[in-house]
Swiss-Prot record:
Belongs to the intradiol ring-cleavage dioxygenase family. PANTHER family: DIOXYGENASE, PUTATIVE (AFU_ORTHOLOGUE AFUA_2G02910)-RELATED, INTRADIOL RING-CLEAVAGE DIOXYGENASES DOMAIN-CONTAINING PROTEIN. InterPro entries: Intradiol_dOase_C, Intradiol_dOase_core, Intradiol_RC_Dioxygenase. The keyword Oxidoreductase applies. This is Putative dioxygenase RT0384. Keywords: Dioxygenase, Oxidoreductase. Its EC number is 1.13.11.-. It comes from Rickettsia typhi (strain ATCC VR-144 / Wilmington).
């Protein structure tokens, strides 16, 4: 009986330390965001983070202006600087307003006959805090399609991530965080933001 109690206490002690070790590791690691691929990316991305218009053009769009923003992190939870972030989405009418990269796609999901200035795509580079943001519009929602945007993040030292962002109430956030253009925040204080912190597989040169 004494031998049994001794073995039980010994194994219980090992289990405590094992759990403690796992908990400690979690403080220095983030869950990697899973890939969700989309076939409707544009053949050519607009080189701006404003999806509402082409650079140098006036904006004329039909829908609700929003911000899509967040941070890019590596698996050690370190902010990733100078990551290329690509975003593409459908407009308020449910169609993508550009020529698709892939040819074997449902052509009914695209249009080039709209008088809207909405481009549906954009690119931005993360700052030294790993932050990014896009000016966009709330996409179409129906019984078949959720309100989503598609995003891809590329960095030379990390695994490329492509996933889908769900623009739902649970992902809404305040406008008082991060580095957003003062002109935008002053003139559009009521604009709704959706925040997404995304984690890429791999590590940068430093660890928090």
């Amino acid at each position: 009986m004494k031998k049994f109690i001794f073995c039980f206490l010994y194994l219980y002690t090992l289990n405590i330390f094992a759990v403690s070790k796992i908990a400690h590791n979690k403080l220095n690691s983030c869950s990697i965001t899973r890939n969700i691929f989309n076939n409707y990316e544009p053949k050519v991305f607009e080189t701006t983070n404003n999806l509402l218009r082409k650079t140098g053009r006036l904006s004329k769009f039909y829908g609700e202006m929003i911000l899509i923003r967040g941070k890019i992190l590596d698996q050690n939870c370190v902010p990733v600087t100078d990551a290329k972030v690509y975003l593409w989405q459908a407009g308020s009418g449910g169609k993508y307003p550009y020529e698709p990269l892939k040819t074997r796609v449902d052509k009914r999901r695209f249009t080039n006959k709209s008088d809207s200035s909405f481009t549906g795509s954009g690119i931005v580079t993360t700052n030294n805090k790993g932050e990014y943001y896009f000016i966009s519009m709330l996409p179409y929602k129906s019984s078949h399609y959720l309100r989503t945007a598609n995003i891809r993040i590329e960095h030379p030292n990390l695994t490329t991530l492509e996933t889908r962002l769900e623009l739902s109430d649970q992902n809404m956030c305040d406008n008082d965080c991060g580095e957003i253009s003062p002109i935008l925040t002053e003139t559009k204080k009521n604009i709704q933001s959706y925040c997404f912190d995304l984690v890429l597989q791999g590590t940068t040169l430093k660890r928090y």
